[in-house]
Structures are given as structure tokens and as C-alpha cells.
Amino acid sequence: MPGKKSPYGLFAGGKLKRKRKRFKWNDVTYKRKMLGLVEKYDPLEGAPMARGIVLEKVGVEARKPNAAVRKCVRVQLVKNGKVVTAFVPLDGSLNYINEHDEVVIERIGGPEGRSLGDIPGVRFKVIKVNGVSLWAIWSGKKQKPTR
């Protein structure tokens, strides 16, 4: 008769804890968290938002089955010089953003910190332009300040 995989008995607790501690490292999410890989490769370096300068406007084609060009901007972050692509939400709001504008970006809110919906490779979205909320400019409540 073959033996059991796990120890059992009154004093098996220590052995069970040691086994659990060892086999936890086979879990990808645990390993990434413990080794700090998310912060290590994160352009925002763990911060919720970041300031950046708009380098260019780009159109990103939506994934199947949708056919659209999602309006995005390439942004160079002030804090570390990394260049990321950020989605511009709201209809026609790309018209309020020019090159060399200062924008604030945040995570787009996709699953596991990744891209959202049908926009491939875009993990961030624009929330402010030159210190004013993009939504306020778009809805006509405020005017975009000229730098």
C-alpha cells in the first residue's frame, strides 16, 4: 500500500507549514508579489498617477470584433523619462490635447493591471490636461489654460 503524500498526526503541523511555505513559490501571483516584479517594471513606479509631456497623438486600432481607431497619446513621464501610451477618453476630447501639453495619467483599470477591453497594449488613460480635469474641459465647465 503506497504512503500518503501529506504527513498527518498530532505533531505534523510544523512539517505541513514548511511544505506550504515551499510550494507557495509555484504560484505565479505569489512569486510576482514577493519578488516585487510589478513595481520593478511599472512605469509609474507604484504611484497611482503620474505627470507627463505629450509627444504625439496616435490612433490605436481596436481588437476584433470591433472596428475602430481608439484615440491615444504617447506620453513621456516627468519622473523617469519612460514613454507610455495613454488612452484619451470622452468623445472628441483629443481635440483639447496638443503636443507638448502636460497631462496627468492614471491606470486604465484593466484586469491584473493590464489593458482594458479592445484597446491592445494601452494600460493608462489621461485624466488632466495642463492641470485641469479633461472631463471639465470636455463638458464646458472650464477652459483649458494656455501655457
Swiss-Prot record:
Domain of life from the UniProt record: Archaea
Any one GO CC term of the record: small ribosomal subunit
Keyword tags: Ribonucleoprotein, Ribosomal protein, RNA-binding, rRNA-binding
Keyword Hydrolase carried by entry: no
CDD domains per the UniProt record, alphabetical: Ribosomal_S23 (cd03367)
GO molecular function, one term: structural constituent of ribosome
Biological processes per GO annotation: translation
Pfam families attached to this UniProt entry: Ribosom_S12_S23 (PF00164)
Coiled coil region boundaries: none
SUPFAM superfamilies: Nucleic acid-binding proteins (SSF50249)
UniProt xrefs under NCBIfam families: PRK04211.1, uS12_E_A
SUBUNIT field: Part of the 30S ribosomal subunit.
Family named by the database record: Belongs to the universal ribosomal protein uS12 family.
Biological role: With S4 and S5 plays an important role in translational accuracy. Located at the interface of the 30S and 50S subunits.
Protein name, per record: Small ribosomal subunit protein uS12
Organism: Pyrobaculum arsenaticum (strain DSM 13514 / JCM 11321 / PZ6)
